[in-house]
Each structure stands twice: as structure tokens, then as C-alpha cells.
């Protein structure tokens, strides 16, 4: 097969591993810079152009779309969909998962376990907003943040009020969530491919750090999932309509709660922690499912 990887970083671990895994299985792989693609969207014959030429037909496209280029990146993915190319994660599913508020609303509607979450623009009663999610300590998140950036822990009511007021002053959209203390600064990243969890790791935040992101100095190790955790991850991926994703889960007293569904999960940490060929499993999924015009909208909302 001829496979395209949409990525701005050909040297990034995940991009390199996907390319290596596909080539090892005899496929032709092209790494394409998403922002350098351009399109004639009114043409009766949809195409994507790159470096002055029309791109050849690809049997499959693997989108590795960074959060900062979601709008343009999903437009490029959508153009490939119009051409009948099989895409690993479709454009609407990527957009759905990138909107933290929208994704939480959709997961909540389907009964997925979530931390109590508040959303407001300019509340006339900040104290009530904080009380409504269980009171301090609370976690305050920027809707546009990634890799733990824009996530702060407010340990007292006064600190929480001050932080919320500060974000409001910047006209920033924020989520206010209950702090799951019993998780102990750890979360579980479940890698879902084709409707099943193929790998899972426990990420532990650095000492004194409540965020478990590996980019923030956290560590990772192999973890055994419970049946409930596995089912939660699979259902969350299905609701988002994603074929390949990372589902981040916290172990709360009441059961697993989903923090985020990542449509472009990094492979380095989970491959090292589990020793599994995750990239190879993604390529295997493509081999089994890539057919022309097979992409269809999954998930709702």
C-alpha cells in the first residue's frame, strides 16, 4: 500500500516509528507536512496539492495533527476523505476530541465516568461554581491547553476564586474540575486501536507535581487494567468516533473517570513502558481496514 503520514515533524519518535513499521511490512510511506498542503475545494475532482504538484492517490492517511493546527489540519484530512482515501481518524472525530468541553458533554451523555466539571464564562457567583464541583481543591484547565500546559491546582477556596477571576480577566475559556485526590498524581493512558485496548501504561507525576504528563517529568510503567477500565476506554473511543486514540483515565474511588481522549497519542512513552510494537499494530489495523471510500462518520455530536 501507499501510505501518507500527515506530520510536521518527520524526526519525531511517533512519526519515525509509524514510517519504520509500515516500511517493514512492505508499504510505501510518504511523510507530508500538513501546513504545506493546499487544495482547490471547488474542483469537481477533489485533490490535494503539495510542492507544486498534485499528490498521488494514497491507500491510507495517518493524521498526526498537532493541537495548534487543528482547524487547517482537519481541513486537509477532510479533503482526503472527499477523494475516497481511507483515513485512520476522520476529520470530524479529530475536531470532536480536540474540543475538551464538547467531548466531555458527549461522554457524559453516554454515561462515561467523569470528574465533576463546571464551565463558565463570567459567572456571577464564583463561590457557587466551585461548590458545585465539590469544593476546593479544584483543577482549573484552559480549554486550549495540551501536555499539562494551562492546568493548575487550586488547593483552597480563596486561591480557586483568585485563579478563576484571573482567567476571566484574560477572557479565557476554562473548565473547573474536582480534584481526584485518591489518584495520587497518577493516571492511566489506554491506547485504543480498532475498538480494543492494545496497550496501557500508568503515568506517575514527578514529586510534588499533580500532573502526570511525561512532558512534565512524569514516569511511566506497565499497568494491568480492570475490566471496567478497559470497557471505559473502548467506549470513550467509540463515542468520539476514533479508530486510534489515547484515553486518559484516573482511578477514582467510584470507578474509572476519563480525563481526556487524545486523537494523536504519542507512541514513545507507551512503547517503552509496555515493550509493545504499538506502531506495528496501528499499521496492521490499516492493512485490515483500508478500502476506498470506507471512511464514514462515526460517533454523534
Swiss-Prot record:
Cofactor note: Binds 2 magnesium or manganese ions per subunit.
GO MF entry, a single one: metal ion binding
Name recorded for this polypeptide: Probable alpha-L-glutamate ligase
Keyword Hydrolase: no
Residues engaged in binding Mg(2+) 1: 248, 260
Matching Gene3D superfamilies: 3.40.50.20, ATP-grasp fold, A domain (3.30.1490.20), ATP-grasp fold, B domain (3.30.470.20)
Annotated binding of Mn(2+) 1, by residue: 248, 260
EC number: 6.3.2.-
Family listed: Belongs to the RimK family.
Annotated residues for binding of Mn(2+) 2: 260, 262
Domain ATP-grasp: 104-287
Residues where Mg(2+) 2 binds: 260, 262
Binding site for ATP: 141, 178-179, 187, 211-213
Pfam families: RimK, Rimk_N
Keyword annotations from UniProtKB, A to Z: ATP-binding, Ligase, Magnesium, Manganese, Metal-binding, Nucleotide-binding, Protein biosynthesis
SUPFAM superfamilies, per the entry: Glutathione synthetase ATP-binding domain-like
EC supergroup of this enzyme: ligase
Amino acid at each position: 500500500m501507499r501510505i501518507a503520514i500527515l506530520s510536521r515533524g518527520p524526526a519525531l519518535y511517533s512519526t519515525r516509528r509509524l514510517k519504520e513499521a509500515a516500511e517493514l511490512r512492505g508499504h510505501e510511506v510518504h511523510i507530508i507536512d500538513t501546513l504545506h498542503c493546499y487544495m482547490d475545494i471547488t474542483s469537481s475532482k477533489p485533490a490535494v496539492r503539495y510542492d507544486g504538484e498534485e499528490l498521488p492517490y494514497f491507500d491510507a492517511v495517518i493524521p498526526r495533527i498537532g493541537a495548534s493546527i487543528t482547524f487547517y489540519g482537519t481541513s486537509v484530512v477532510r479533503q482526503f476523505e472527499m477523494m475516497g482515501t481511507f483515513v485512520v481518524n476522520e476529520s470530524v472525530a479529530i475536531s470532536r476530541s480536540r474540543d475538551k468541553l464538547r467531548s466531555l458533554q458527549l461522554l457524559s451523555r453516554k454515561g462515561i465516568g467523569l470528574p465533576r466539571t463546571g464551565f463558565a464564562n463570567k459567572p456571577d457567583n464564583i463561590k457557587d461554581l466551585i461548590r458545585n464541583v465539590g469544593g476546593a481543591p479544584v483543577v482549573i484547565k484552559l480549554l486550549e491547553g495540551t501536555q499539562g500546559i494551562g492546568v493548575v491546582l487550586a488547593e483552597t477556596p480563596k486561591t480557586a476564586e483568585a485563579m478563576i477571576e484571573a482567567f476571566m480577566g484574560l477572557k479565557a475559556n476554562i473548565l473547573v474540575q474536582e480534584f481526584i485526590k485518591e489518584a495520587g498524581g497518577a493516571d492511566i493512558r489506554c491506547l485504543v486501536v480498532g475498538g480494543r485496548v492494545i496497550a496501557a501504561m500508568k503515568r506517575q507525576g514527578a514529586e510534588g507535581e499533580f500532573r502526570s504528563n511525561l512532558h512534565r517529568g512524569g514516569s511511566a510503567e506497565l499497568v494491568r487494567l480492570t475490566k471496567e477500565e478497559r470497557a471505559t476506554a473502548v467506549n470513550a473511543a467509540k463515542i468520539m468516533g476514533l479508530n486510534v486514540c489515547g484515553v486518559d483515565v484516573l482511578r477514582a474511588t467510584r470507578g474509572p473517570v476519563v480525563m481526556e481522549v487524545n486523537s494523536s497519542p504519542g507512541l514513545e512513552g507507551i512503547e517503552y513502558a509496555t515493550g509493545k510494537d504499538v506502531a506495528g499494530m496501528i499499521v496492521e489495523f490499516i492493512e485490515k481496514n483500508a478500502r476506498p471510500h470506507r471512511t464514514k462518520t462515526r460517533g454523534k455530536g
